[in-house]
């Protein structure tokens, strides 16, 4: 269907571009004067078969228009050697081209490069591929002069394919080659991607551990400072959101951590107190955020009434209490507990003590075992540093 459509389009274009018959007469006479090709009549191509004229007509069209017509019709073009229409071969991309390098060194000289064996995990095929690549090239070394670059994957050494060979064996082959080394390398970005992926997983695991330690410290702080045992973990997310809102709105002049802000009531930074309402069992945390330098308030004026004779023996600290040392802003967060605030204080204290004694050890054991399981999926990290990276 596609070839028929293209033939019709070609005939229409020829009909519109053809001149008048008077102007076409000399061409026809010249065609009659030209000798006919010798040969049997059966050698002529049938009118319906695609030939050189058809391919010439197809090459006149723009490739984008031709591909669009093929996509709409669902047809394909007949293949022919030497045809101008070929699909791009992405397997021969520049980053997958191999190159052969010859390194020459002196008797008391090294080649000047370091190799490392890494494991690439293919999720689709559920397998791990061990790849040996160049991780470092020294300055003004035979390796740099030969054109070896960091990131080159070593495919063969002295004509020997090193696929599936262990790291130590590859090092022995290179050391036994003498002063002349012939390497076949393959450059690609898969090694760099694998390194970044492994580092990303490690940072995610570290962040998970630090976040767990941070929440554990917040639990201990609430228990030690306020005497509270909060079972709902969403309270810490609420406190974090309030703190971020205060920082974003500019209410807090300094970016202080949340731990010093929830200090003891007598500290210079600020204090915290717990208040319990009469009609509601919710818990209110009020945090006072003070400035960096405490500013003393002016003393209150003395009372106007006359003092009796017994007031002479009263200490001055009772009559004139000390002013507050800092000007502070307060932010209250209402966190309703699931079970109310009417529990026995002895049971709460016992539960908090058990959490403080057992929670940290269990949490550390869990994180350590999770990290050990994570390292099992990275074969390059399970081996020793001597086997993983070698200087040549």
Curated annotation (Swiss-Prot):
SUPFAM superfamilies, A to Z: PDZ domain-like (SSF50156)
Record text on subunit structure and interactions: Heteromer. Composed of TAMALIN, CYTH2 and at least one GRM1. Also interacts with GRM2, GRM3 and GRM5. Interacts with CYTH3.
Cell compartment(s), UniProt: Cytoplasm, Perinuclear region; Cell membrane; Postsynaptic cell membrane
Residues with the Phosphothreonine modification: 76
Domain of life: Eukaryota
Protein name, per record: General receptor for phosphoinositides 1-associated scaffold protein
Protein keywords: Cell membrane, Cytoplasm, Membrane, Methylation, Phosphoprotein, Postsynaptic cell membrane, Synapse
Residues that bear Phosphotyrosine: 236
GO annotation, biological process: intracellular protein transport; regulation of postsynaptic neurotransmitter receptor internalization; signal transduction
Record-linked InterPro entries: Intracell_Traff_Signaling_Reg, PDZ, PDZ_sf
Gene3D superfamilies noted in UniProt: 2.30.42.10
Species name: Mus musculus
